[in-house]
């Protein structure tokens, strides 16, 4: 949203206590008047009136009332159960009850609260009951009758108690819906008057007071409003201006304990809780919520600078990782679970919202006894905690693509200040379920393609490994073939050398002192000697017909035979090794 002062909303001063308020304070019982005055005095000490933005100012004041009366410790489900225990669910909405019965209701609420808390955390029930009752009377009993309507009590307590805003709105709709499940416009007008009485009670009537204009800002008189449309209107961005403080009140409760380990550049506090604001123009310039709301600055920073609101803290490393992750995403996420930034008035329902009317409501038992049942029944429209994505403050735009929205907002606030009642209702409130289905289908297809690519990569990697093994086996085979060829050549050389020696033995002259042929012919021979052929036969014949000295020739022949034997043994070993390698590859599946 674009605001005229660049850094926040129009400065709308809170109203001081009016004369009517003082007359009402004097007309109520003294005890109630004193307790109400005590609340007002303590609220003034918090200096909420110095907050520049009316929305934040109203939310801060009501948050103070919540914490002071301890009603923020009671959730919506226990509050509804207290209504049932005291029989308020069986009474018509405009039934008037006495102050004593309202006090009995508050007694039930806070006594049940102490039963759920440990002893060290018990609240002072008397103080809480008296303060809350005084606030209710100050807000709704303007005529000093000492009575309150059932509807005003339900609206006030359901608004101020703890719990999710969507659950509270469902309960409120159950109170203002007809038997067909559609909103009754007369009851809605009454509801709006009751809830805006809370902001009027904390002196924010100039901005958030009830008027016919406020009713027209929400719905047209002839519009059929179902539960989904009702929720979508109050949880949309932006919601109707008269009720903008309501979602902010719940977001304040959710970030009240969020810790930011950074230094505020205005007040120099080393760390703080709540919201954190970062300037989009000044380098690493950050402010705590108190300084930003009240316009405190330092250095060259100006309130005209654009600011972003953060509800949690991320270290620079996490921010970098998150930015890289978002840049690599093919499809934008529809919801962010852990994001740290929020739109100041953004509340989204966790699922597509249908514009069809909800089924008729049973007003006698509209709210289930347990939260689990109602969450199951409304799973399509239940909302999670407030989103935490970084966005601009109301009136700020970080991108040039929303200029049209900025002009619309300027026109809206100009019309509001000039007193016109026209409020352009937002169109396209429900999400397109077909688009969601298409996105899911596309995601499934991409996941399937990714799985196929992973399987194909694994197959190619396995094939590459197999090819490498086959190439190594081929190289080994070539090496063995080369060795076999070399050994065969060596064998041929040795055989030629042996034949040459045999030829010398057969053709050489006989020594003078040698053995006679007759003596050699008389040497005994075995059967194996007679079977010698080839070289062995030549050797045998050489010994029988000795022509050279026997000792020399025998040594040469034995040496040649040893070399042939060694060469053949090496050849056999190499062949056996090659055969074992081939068998191993076959076993491994190559």
Curated annotation (Swiss-Prot):
Top-level taxon: Eukaryota
Q: In which tissues is it expressed?
A: From late embryogenesis to adulthood, expressed in neurons and muscles; particularly strong in the ventral nerve cord and in muscles of the body wall, head pharyngeal, and vulva; weaker in the intestinal muscle (at protein level).
Say if the entry is tagged with keyword Zinc.
Answer: yes
Kindly indicate whether the keyword Zinc-finger belongs to this entry: yes
Subcellular location as annotated: Cytoplasm
Essential for interaction with ctn-1: annotated segments = 468-590
User: In what ranges is there compositional bias, type Gly residues?
Assistant: 1-10
Which segments carry the region annotation Disordered? Answer: 1-25
Sites binding Zn(2+) 2 sit at 279, 282, 301, 305
Q: Which GO terms describe its biological process?
A: acetylcholine transport; establishment of synaptic specificity at neuromuscular junction; locomotory behavior; muscle cell cellular homeostasis; positive regulation of locomotion; positive regulation of synaptic transmission, cholinergic; sarcomere organization; synaptic signaling
Coiled-coil intervals: 434-508
Q: Which GO terms describe its molecular function?
A: acetylcholine transmembrane transporter activity; cytoskeletal protein binding; zinc ion binding
Which stretches does the record call ZZ-type zinc fingers?
259-315
Q: Which Pfam families match?
A: EF-hand_2 (PF09068), EF-hand_3 (PF09069), ZZ (PF00569)
Its keywords, alphabetically, are: Coiled coil, Cytoplasm, Metal-binding, Zinc, Zinc-finger
GO CC field: cytoplasm; dystrobrevin complex; dystrophin-associated glycoprotein complex; plasma membrane; synapse
The function of this protein is: Plays a role in cholinergic transmission and as a functional partner of dystrophin (dys-1), necessary for muscle maintenance. Required for localization of ctn-1 near dense bodies in muscle cells.
Q: How does it assemble?
A: Component of the dystrophin glycoprotein complex (DGC). Interacts with dystrophin (dys-1) and syntrophin (stn-1) to form the DGC. Interacts (via C-terminus) with ctn-1 (via N-terminus); the interaction is required for localization of the dystrophin complex and ctn-1 near dense bodies in muscle cells.
> Protein name, please?
Dystrobrevin-1
């Amino acid at each position: 949203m674009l605001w005229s002062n660049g850094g926040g909303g129009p400065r709308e001063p809170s109203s001081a206590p009016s004369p009517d308020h003082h007359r009402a304070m004097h007309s109520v019982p003294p005890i109630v008047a004193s307790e109400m005055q005590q609340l007002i005095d303590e609220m003034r000490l918090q200096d909420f009136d110095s907050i520049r933005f009316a929305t934040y100012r109203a939310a801060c004041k009501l948050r103070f009332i919540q914490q002071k009366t301890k009603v923020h410790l009671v959730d919506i489900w226990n509050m509804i159960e207290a209504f049932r225990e005291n029989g308020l669910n069986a009474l018509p909405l405009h039934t008037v009850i006495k102050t004593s019965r309202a006090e009995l209701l508050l007694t039930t609420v806070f006594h049940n609260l102490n039963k759920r808390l440990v002893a060290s955390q018990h609240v002072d029930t008397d103080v809480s009951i008296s303060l809350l009752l005084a606030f209710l009377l100050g807000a709704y009993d303007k005529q000093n009758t000492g009575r309150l309507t059932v509807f005003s009590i339900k609206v006030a307590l359901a608004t101020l108690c703890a719990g999710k805003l969507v659950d509270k709105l469902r309960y409120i709709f159950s109170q203002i819906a007809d038997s067909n499940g559609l909103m009754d416009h007369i009851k809605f007008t009454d509801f709006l008057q009751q809830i805006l009485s809370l902001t009027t009670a904390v002196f924010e009537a100039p901005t958030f007071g009830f008027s016919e204009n406020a009713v027209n800002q929400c719905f047209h008189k002839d519009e059929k409003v179902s539960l989904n449309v009702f929720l979508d209107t109050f949880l949309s961005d932006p919601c109707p201006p008269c009720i903008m403080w309501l979602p902010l009140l719940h977001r304040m409760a959710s970030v009240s304990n969020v810790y930011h380990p950074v230094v505020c550049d205005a007040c120099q506090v080393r760390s703080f809780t709540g919201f954190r604001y970062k300037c989009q123009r000044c380098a690493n310039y950050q402010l705590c919520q108190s300084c930003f709301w009240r316009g405190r600055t330092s250095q060259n920073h100006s309130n005209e600078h654009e600011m972003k609101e953060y509800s949690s803290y991320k270290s620079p490393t996490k921010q970098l990782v998150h930015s890289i992750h978002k840049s690599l995403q093919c499809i934008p996420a529809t919801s962010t679970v852990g994001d740290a930034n929020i739109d100041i008035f953004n509340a989204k329902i966790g699922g597509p919202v249908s514009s069809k009317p909800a089924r008729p409501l049973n007003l006698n038992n509209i709210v289930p006894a347990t939260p689990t049942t109602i969450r199951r029944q409304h799973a399509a429209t239940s909302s999670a905690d407030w989103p935490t994505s970084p966005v601009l403050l109301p009136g700020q735009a970080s991108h040039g693509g929303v200029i049209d929205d900025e002009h619309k907002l300027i026109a809206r606030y100009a019309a509001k200040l000039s007193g016109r009642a026209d409020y352009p209702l937002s169109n396209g409130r429900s999400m397109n379920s077909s688009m969601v289905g298409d996105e899911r289908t596309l995601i499934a297809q991409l996941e399937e393609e990714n799985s196929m690519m992973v399987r194909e990569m694994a197959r190619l990697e396995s094939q590459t490994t197999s090819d490498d093994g086959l190439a190594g086996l081929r190289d080994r085979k070539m090496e063995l073939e080369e060795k076999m060829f070399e050994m065969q050549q060596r064998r041929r050389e040795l055989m030629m050398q042996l034949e040459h020696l045999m030829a010398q033995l057969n053709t050489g002259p006989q020594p003078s002192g040698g053995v006679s042929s007759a003596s050699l012919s008389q040497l005994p021979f075995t059967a194996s000697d007679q079977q010698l052929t080839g070289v062995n036969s030549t050797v045998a014949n050489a010994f029988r017909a000795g022509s050279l000295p026997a000792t020399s020739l025998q040594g040469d022949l034995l040496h040649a035979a040893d070399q042939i034997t060694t060469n053949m043994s090496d050849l056999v070993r190499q062949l056996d090794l090659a055969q074992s390698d081939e068998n191993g590859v076959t076993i491994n599946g190559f």
